[in-house]
Amino acid sequence: MESVALYSFQATESDELAFNKGDTLKILNMEDDQNWYKAELRGVEGFIPKNYIRVKPHPWYSGRISRQLAEEILMKRNHLGAFLIRESESSPGEFSVSVNNRAQRGPCLGPKSHSRLG
């Protein structure tokens, strides 16, 4: 999972990771400490304060959108296998995956596949 640094941080301990505002850090572990995450920046690993970063959402997660909007988004991505995960409209608390499963035909994409996860 990626995050972006909201502020610069200067490490004061050998196991901490220094970074600058705007850096993109790879989060390796979010579970060991409630205030610190283990992260990587340019091949170096260390702990970072979680309140200094903003976790980037996964590009494939679209949250609460309709099936129709999911299809529109997939048409814009315009490639076979493009997918997204969204909250299920028909089964609250579950998720659906929408996949472009056909190659482009003329001006629009072929059928989409929608499956409920759960």
From Swiss-Prot:
Residues 1-58 form the SH3 domain. GO terms for biological process: cell migration; enzyme-linked receptor protein signaling pathway. Keywords: SH2 domain, SH3 domain. CDD domains: SH3_GRAP_N (cd11948). It holds the Pfam family SH2. Residues 90-103 have a biased composition (Polar residues). One of its GO terms (cellular component) is cytosol. InterPro entries: GRAP_N_SH3 (IPR035645), Grb2-like (IPR043539), SH2 (IPR000980), SH2_dom_sf (IPR036860), SH3-like_dom_sf (IPR036028), SH3_domain (IPR001452). The keyword Transit peptide does not apply. Residues 89-118 are annotated as: Disordered. PROSITE patterns: SH2, SH3. It comes from the Eukaryota. Residues 60-118 form the SH2 domain. One of its GO terms (molecular function) is receptor tyrosine kinase binding. Belongs to the GRB2/sem-5/DRK family. PANTHER family: PROTEIN ENHANCER OF SEVENLESS 2B (PTHR46037). This is GRB2-related adapter protein-like. It comes from Homo sapiens (Human).
